[in-house]
A protein has these predicted regions:
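RNase H-like two-metal-ion nuclease catalytic core shared by retroviral integrases
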Residues: 176-178, 200-222, 235
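C-terminal domain-tail junction helix/linker
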Residues: 104, 234-273
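Charge-mixed, compositionally biased segments that are often intrinsically disordered regulatory tracts
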Residues: 2-10, 17, 21-125, 272-273
């Protein structure tokens, strides 16, 4: 196990990471064991839950005063979403699925007893679309729009359309990440015309605070995977009928337990590291 936790360069090797074959060979070279097979190495690694052959990307959030301020404002909205809704103010999260590929595949072989579903690997591309999703936090309901282009002009055009659909509201607290279309001057100019929109930004590299990311996963797994579209128009029509069905069958407020109190405790622990 100690060998697997060391970098290969420590043993004079220029490979970037260990495989079970490499570890077996090096263990014998170092005299740790007289003989050992890669299979036995894999069993040992499995027992201690060590996976030197795997990696995962991550990005450290910058824990500064701006992070804390933005997180507090977002979490306050989540904690008060129902109370605000009763007063005529919605908390709405927004996010995009950019450049979603429109892929046409051969007919799927549906699952039968003893055989899982099979999907043809080859496909024909029919371009991409940009999908904008709105999540109404206190109900879990969603709305969806297709943007012809992912930029500020198309973004605030869809914001204006959302406002027209909900003109009876007093205002919206809009949770969003720091995407360029969200932070552009044209978008801020649109917001400045009225207090109806009350934008709240997630901290840099902390878009996971936007509950719309949960919606993308919940909606996408049911309506965007394991299927095929012959054209852009066919996919758009599919989306038009899919999001109302999602609201009818699956929508519910997402469970969110991270409060401002918990965030401040977490911040105090990690900001000092």
């Amino acid at each position: 196990m100690q060998l697997a936790c060391r970098e290969p360069i420590a043993k004079g090797l220029h490979i970037t990471h260990w495989s079970s074959d490499d570890l077996a060979r090096q263990a014998m070279v170092d005299g740790i064991v007289e003989t050992i097979s890669p299979r036995t190495v894999r069993q040992i690694l499995h027992e201690v839950d060590l996976q030197p052959h795997r990696t995962r990307y991550w990005k450290t959030s910058r824990l500064d005063a701006l992070f804390k301020k933005r997180a507090e404002r977002v979490l306050w909205c989540y904690g008060n979403a129902r109370r605000l809704a009763a007063r005529g103010y919605w908390v709405v999260c927004v996010d995009e699925i950019p450049n979603f590929q429109i892929l046409e595949r051969r007919p799927i072989r549906r699952a039968i007893p003893g055989s899982i579903e099979h999907q043809e690997f080859e496909y024909t591309r029919h371009g991409t679309i940009n999908v904008l999703l709105f999540l109404i936090v206190h109900t879990g309901h969603m709305e969806l729009a297709v943007e012809n282009k992912k930029d500020a002009n198309h973004y605030f055009h869809e914001l204006a359309a959302f406002r027209r659909r909900h003109r009876g509201l007093k205002g919206v607290f809009l949770i969003q990440d720091g995407d360029p279309s969200h932070t552009a001057g044209a978008t801020h100019a649109y917001w400045s015309k009225s207090r109806w929109w009350r934008p709240r930004f997630t901290p840099a590299h902390a878009s996971w605070l936007d509950q719309a990311e949960l919606l993308i996963k919940a909606f996408g797994s049911r309506y965007l995977k394991r299927t095929s579209w012959e054209s852009r128009e066919q996919l758009i029509e599919h989306l038009k009928v899919s999001w109302p069905e999602y609201n009818r069958l699956y929508a519910h407020p997402f469970e969110w337990y991270w409060t401002n109190h918990q965030m401040r405790q977490w911040f105090a622990r990690h900001a000092a590291e």
